[in-house]
Amino acid sequence: MAKREYPLERTRNIGIMAHIDAGKTTTTERILYYTGKIHKIGETHDGASQMDFMEQEKERGITIQSAATTAVWHGFFDQFAKTPYRVNIIDTPGHVDFTIEVERALRVLDGAVAVLDGAAGVEPQTETVWRQATTYDVPRIVFVNKMDKLGADFQMSVDSIHERLQVNAEAIQWPIGAEDDFEAVIDLITQEAYYPEDDLGEKWAPREIPEELKELAEEKRNTLIEAVADVDDDLMEKYLEGEDISIEELKAAIRRATLALQFYPVLAGSAYKDKGVQMMLDAVVDYLPGPLDVKPYIANDPKTDEEIDLIADDSKPFAALAFKIMTDPFVGRLTFMRVYTGTLKSGSYVQNTSSDTRERVGRLLQMHATSRTEIEEVFSGDIAAAIGLKNTTTGDSLTDVSHQLILESMEFPEPVIELAIEPKTKADQDKLSNAIQKLAEEDPSFRATTNQETGQTLIAGMGELQLDIMVDRMRREFNVEATVGAPQVAYREAFTKTVQARGFFKRQSGGKGQYGDVYIEFAPNEEGAGFEFEDAIVGGVVPREYIPSVEAGLKDALNAGPLAGFPLVDLKAKLYDGSYHDVDSSEAAFKIAASLALKEAAKTAGAVILEPIMAVDIVAPEDNLGDVMGHVSARRGMIEGQESRGPVLAVKAKVPLSEMFGYATTLRSATQGRGTFQMVFDHYEAVPKNIQEEIIKTNGQED
């Protein structure tokens, strides 16, 4: 029997999260180098990074899928040489199209490192991932990276955390120098300066703090103590009584406050210049939680419906969450899972309580970004990959066969952008179906539908980049040659009034005829509530056996709305009357009658077309404020606020997605390439009348 190598208190499951280009992947790369996982450092801009292992990631220099890897940390000064820590790291994407990957990673992590660009501070996507981490109660430390970059300003970065994230965060280190002069780091807790002794930053030596920075270091240490004392009673008591606070006491208080989500330690460094990463790893060990420090994970017993606390314990029955599915070119389908409690051996059976199927785990793997080690057994608190699970998808619960539990699943957003994809040959058609199925298993925010009338396949997702990459993967990994249409907005349709309508279908053509007759009341439902069907038939005027056909007929009809053929959403339907014929009535006749009732209702129900509205963050030089305001109003947008961020201005707005296509080019030319923007789906809203008429003209339904 395999033995646990690292006790739970020496295990850390962490995520590295940030805005795109803050240097997340490079930071992870250095972690792997310093923990001995790789022997050569790969740079993202050379396309050689270990964590970016998909072709598209290497070409684009961005991280798309959160690769999981395991590293072992012995301490900056080998202080954990005899008791090393296992650190499981999930590198997450910073691009807004892939926030689903971030959500998915945060769900299974215990702690996170938020990486900031030292010249930009908190950026729009930082705010998004920070909010996501807060939702999942994930303790965080902040690593202000790129301190060697032109414009790097540590104080500005710390201030931006206070202003934009509104949290209690203070520096536990201070950089010596910035930009090209960034040379060392002051540890504010120990009041020592650390200087590198070699080019790769492997050896560092403590020195006295330079004379001109001593006063600043003392002042910043006091600021730190005050911030932690504010949320920690033990420290507050000592502080108020004017007692000396030892290094150990301060570190213990920082840990307590960080775990309680009441304080966020801030560190400085430059991953690219090999400075500060090992100190950040020490902070991961010192301040971020192990599996025993987080609040218990809640599961449900499907038999009794009672809630059960899952506490990391190898002696308890096995329970894990499948948080990612990937297709590996060498070993096939991989299921990444986080083990919450119990242990699991390769070759054993698990119960997938989400799909109510029993599955056999063929092999278990410990993952490094592109390589893997086979292991005999996984323990509570581990993150590992399993081979052989055929019916498991993202968000499924995997538990002991004799102790079945359902773990809280994950919610995935509805796609807002779609494009048509046309296979070039019949052989490509089959390959396309296979590719879509595999890619949708890996990324639940990617969907595909087929238009029943035209036979056209539409793929949908959260943004252009995501769909771009999916099409690229279809070509490279599945050899699908296809023609791709321009991106389109995923419009929806909805009723705005409550109406009653009759659907009557009768056909006599010699022999058995067809007869179905229904009266249905249609009413708008709340946004996002979907379709609700109510059977209010009394006295059997529509026999029981035909009622499911009425519901099925309505559901089919919802796929193509009355105005322009977009899906009809958020609708209540109440079947309250009807009639039937002893001989001629059938399921098919009632199905058709239901769809006729919906068609009839659409004439008076005030049907509208809904469009996705995006929350847009535009960052541009102050001189371009007028341009940006003009861009937003020309695109039917609403400005919601603006703030100054050093030399640039950030404008927040709500803009229809249909108006944002091609905006990157407009903004680039207006700001000479200095403006950037990000957008994320916010809500659906009815389009103005004149635009609705244009959309109907373009996509119009034939009566």
From Swiss-Prot:
The intrachain disulfides are none
Q: Which GO terms describe its cellular component?
A: cytoplasm
The residue ranges of the tr-type G domain are 9-292
- Localization per record: Cytoplasm
Q: Name one GO molecular function term.
A: GTPase activity
Q: Name one GO biological process term.
A: ribosome disassembly
Which domain of life does the protein's organism represent?
Bacteria
Ordered alphabetically, the record's keywords are: Cytoplasm, Elongation factor, GTP-binding, Nucleotide-binding, Protein biosynthesis
Family matches, as SUPFAM superfamilies: EF-G C-terminal domain-like, P-loop containing nucleoside triphosphate hydrolases, Ribosomal protein S5 domain 2-like, Translation proteins
**Keyword Cell membrane part of the UniProt annotation:** no
Q: What does this protein do?
A: Catalyzes the GTP-dependent ribosomal translocation step during translation elongation. During this step, the ribosome changes from the pre-translocational (PRE) to the post-translocational (POST) state as the newly formed A-site-bound peptidyl-tRNA and P-site-bound deacylated tRNA move to the P and E sites, respectively. Catalyzes the coordinated movement of the two tRNA molecules, the mRNA and conformational changes in the ribosome.
The text of the family note is:
Belongs to the TRAFAC class translation factor GTPase superfamily. Classic translation factor GTPase family. EF-G/EF-2 subfamily.
Q: What is this protein called?
A: Elongation factor G
Organism name: Leuconostoc mesenteroides subsp. mesenteroides (strain ATCC 8293 / DSM 20343 / BCRC 11652 / CCM 1803 / JCM 6124 / NCDO 523 / NBRC 100496 / NCIMB 8023 / NCTC 12954 / NRRL B-1118 / 37Y)
This protein's encoding gene: fusA
